[in-house]
Amino acid sequence: MLMGIATLFIVSYIKNEHTTDLSRITIDDMQLNAKIDKDKFIEDDEILLKKHNLYTKHNQPNLVFKVNKGNSKIMGMTLIKNTDVNTNFGGKIEGNIQDVVHHLGSSYKQKKLRDAYRLMIYYDKDNHIKLSIIYKHDKIKKIEVYSK
């Protein structure tokens, strides 16, 4: 009986856990699941993945796109160092982390990392998307968004 009640509470918690809609997230006007024109990108041939290729733009080597080999759709994006790249959710390298919270809300998980770095994670359970932001002293250092 006690196990049944505990299971009910766990299932209820998981279903009621907050999720954030990340389906329209963009970095440099690029969106997950959008097709890319491979001619406008540089393929990173140093890293070999089974189902994906990694690409960068000619003028932005610090913005990396993980692209499905089969359908050329963007499955993930990682941004570091480049302070000129904008997002549509308030996140920008060296920008304030509170700008992201203002745009996306407080339904995130947070972890402490080494050397005063922190990790903020937003989940979109409906669209299977994860947004991870590493920051230090409220200044964003790295932005990653991936879908399954």
Language model segments and positions:
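Aromatic-capped interface at the extracytoplasmic side
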Residues: 13-21
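N-proximal short alpha-helices
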Residues: 12, 73-74
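A cross-family detector of function-defining hotspots
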Residues: 21, 29-73, 83, 92-139, ...
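Hydrophobic membrane-insertion alpha-helices, especially the h-region
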Residues: 1-12
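Terminal, regulation- and interaction-focused segments at domain boundaries
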Residues: 77, 83-87
